[in-house]
Amino acid sequence: MAASVDPLVVGRVIGDVLDMFIPTANMSVYFGPKHITNGCEIKPSTAVNPPKVNISGHSDELYTLVMTDPDAPSPSEPNMREWVHWIVVDIPGGTNPSRGKEILPYMEPRPPVGIHRYILVLFRQNSPVGLMVQQPPSRANFSTRMFAGHFDLGLPVATVYFNAQKEPASRRR
Amino acid sequence: MAISMSMAMATPTDSVSRVWSMSSLKSALPSTASLRLPSSSSRRPVTLRLPISSPSLPSFSGLSPVNPLLSIGLPDWQSFENGFKIVDGGGRIYAMRHGRRVPKLNRPPDQRKALLRGLTTQLLKHGRIKTTRARASAMRKFVDKMITLAKDGSLHKRRQALGYIYEKQIVHALFAEVPDRYGERNGGYTRIIRTLPRRGDNAPMAYIELV
């Protein structure tokens, strides 16, 4: 019996990756023509290029976007939780991540086994952090909570997640 | 022994004294009660009565509703409310599905078992699978059963798991990691998340994942 109907709680995004937060900003994510809703299924072939993300807010506010996969390498054995795919900081409000500073270049989802969740988290920055942030040593074993705590980003302001699984090599007849 | 045979045929309720006792009840049973009669007969002189009226012996008497008090414990026992249904093996058959909790999944029993075995194998292998809601809710029981077997960890349980899961490596991996992962959790090792229906036939789909 679901204790909550919030899709982020049901999908255990809040819990595995994030803490409970109140969304204060709007973020709409598009992979090509497809709009991302919580829990929708995306094929890795459509996610090769970074998505178009529209962030609400004033242009004097700065935002940070992080995309992680908590189910790496497999949801039954997430040894490398989380695998970070993309980090962009200093995004001015009301624009998209191309106007920010890309700390970690975008890597497309490549789930080897099982169905993985890919979470896009948006934080509001209190101050520009462009110079302090460095690329994490490896993409594996990333912790979004620790990243937010390290740069004093606080709780997220918006989150969306989607599922992806490995596409079959040959088309099903 | 003639006395024990006759006492086996005595009916408890058509005595004048209306003595209900366990020994008199047992004496009405057809077979095994005769072993206990030596002890009970010493306590209750009533059971030593020879039968006077025996045509109300509760044997099969067609489809007429038999007095339920006379037929307790016999294989032809019919329920109070519908005395006209045919009963076999002690199970009741009703026209409606009331109280039947086994999901049939539109398959005969052998196929159903094979489907559930395959689904639990794949869930234990991949950690999260997408399937129809009926199948997801049907397989919860069997996934929990496999994880409980792994929690126990003995050789017998391992062999039982090997008899159910289709792939050996999955069983061995399961037995290796379950004590760490599910040691404190009591039951409820899966989670079902409903999702959008399937395009081809609008079947309601769900993700089922290991918690």
Swiss-Prot record, chain A:
Give an example GO biological process: abscisic acid-activated signaling pathway
Q: Does the keyword Cytoplasm apply?
A: yes
Q: Which residues form a coiled coil?
A: none
Concerning SUPFAM superfamilies, the annotation shows: PEBP-like
Under the heading PROSITE patterns, the entry gives: PBP (PS01220)
Disruption outcome: No visible phenotype under normal growth conditions, but mutant seeds show hypersensitivity to ABA during seed germination.
InterPro entries given in the database record:
PEBP (IPR008914), PEBP-like_sf (IPR036610), PEBP_euk (IPR035810), Phosphatidylethanolamine-bd_CS (IPR001858)
Keyword Cytoplasm annotated: yes
Which positions does the record annotate as the modified residue N-acetylalanine? Answer: A2
What does the UniProt induction comment state?
A: By abscisic acid.
Keyword list (alphabetical) reads: Abscisic acid signaling pathway, Acetylation, Cytoplasm
Q: Name one GO cellular component term.
A: nucleus
Subcellular compartments = Cytoplasm
Expressed in which tissues: Expressed in gametophytes and developing seeds.
What does this protein do, in the record's words?
Answer: May form complexes with phosphorylated ligands by interfering with kinases and their effectors. Regulates seed germination via the abscisic acid (ABA) and gibberellic acid (GA)signaling pathways. During seed germination, MFT expression is directly repressed by ABI3 or promoted by ABI5 in the ABA signaling pathway. Involved in a negative feedback regulation of ABA signaling. Promotes embryo growth by direct repression of ABI5. In the GA signaling pathway, MFT expression is promoted by the DELLA protein RGL2 during seed germination.
By sequence similarity, the record places it as follows:
Belongs to the phosphatidylethanolamine-binding protein family.
Protein's UniProt name: Protein MOTHER of FT and TFL1
Gene source species: Arabidopsis thaliana
What is the phylogenetic placement of the source species in the record?
Eukaryota, Viridiplantae, Streptophyta, Embryophyta, Tracheophyta
